[in-house]
Amino acid sequence: MKDVLLIKYGELALKGENRSFFENTLVKNIKYALRDFDGVKVEKTHGRIYVECEKDVEEAIERLKKVFGIVGITRAKEADLDLEEIFKAAVDLMKSHQGKTFKVETKRPNKAFPYNSMEVSRRVGAAVLKNVKNMKVDVHNPDVLLNVEIREKAFLYAGVIEGAGGLPLGTNGKATVLLSGGIDSPVAAWMMMKRGVEVEAVYFHSPPYTSDRAKEKVVDLCKVLSQYGRGMRLHVVHFTDLQLEIYEKCPARLTTIIMRRMMMKIAEKIAQQNGSLALITGESLGQVASQTIESLYVTNSSVSLPVFRPLIGMDKREIIDIAQKIGTYEISIRPYEDCCTIFVPKHPATKPKLEKVLEAEEKMDYQKFIDNFEEEVIEI
């Protein structure tokens, strides 16, 4: 008998012919998450993934809770396919639940085992009642559900720790997120990562109008997001010269939308260089002037790559709730301005016309900035 972590996954089981690809990617991501743990073994057999961890089990569980594709983690007992060994495992597991009501549920994928599920449940329950003090059976509303799985070995567990869910990172291609340092864009990145998308980030830095602390904030956000993946690459684009060009030569009410279009063009160029097939933004419909449906239409027309906006139908409270859950909120609210909050016009256009925007852009030579932007790449 030994202790293992039993990894449960949801959507992967529905992937048909591609199932092994998703499972193997999940195994790779689990190994990466536990890469600095000694004596860790990760094994995939018959629709289950098992993790053996000699020490620091609680820390291992905390790491695994951030691995996309895992819906649940259980601390399980692994026993030989022998009833007496199964009884010992059940008693050992249930000693920490003395005085509670319980129910035993058995699954028997291994049909070669000579006892059916009902018989295993009955016998395991009897062993618990005999050897653990003050236990009572309640088949309708038990305090503890003791699960028994009969596979190549027997696995027993009670209780499931919730995982991050979603799909394993790296199973749905790559995209590039425009990361501002605010509340929204890190949440948008996290939501796409949850769908299996590998993410690189672009941050637009405008010194001296934005400080190094603003850049450090974005680096810290990437560090949090990287805990859900396999590291992250951050592209820091120096945006001051192009931003000044916009505000000197374009109508004030159009400067915000034109700035967004220039950011999209530069982000698209970076995305195409790093193999991304889409851009990600943290825009939510109607939240600010640049996020009306008319503004988003004009913004989209600046690029050819698809633009994913996972927050588009969410309100601010919903976004903040996720930011707090994933650990980015306290970083995002640090009081350092990003380039989107400087030079903001008093009355930005909320329903810009594409032809008017294109006409305004002709007044400046933006292409030279896009072709020759200064970039710093930070590996996180």
Curated annotation (Swiss-Prot):
Its EC number is 2.8.1.4. ATP binds at residues 178-179, 203-204, 260, 282, 291. Pathway: Cofactor biosynthesis; thiamine diphosphate biosynthesis. GO terms for biological process: thiamine biosynthetic process; thiamine diphosphate biosynthetic process; thiazole biosynthetic process; tRNA 4-thiouridine biosynthesis. GO terms for molecular function: ATP binding; CCA tRNA nucleotidyltransferase activity; tRNA binding; tRNA-uracil-4 sulfurtransferase activity. One of its GO terms (cellular component) is cytosol. Residues 58-162 form the THUMP domain. Belongs to the ThiI family. This is Probable tRNA sulfurtransferase. The lineage of its organism: Bacteria, Bacillati, Bacillota, Clostridia, Thermoanaerobacterales. The gene is thiI.
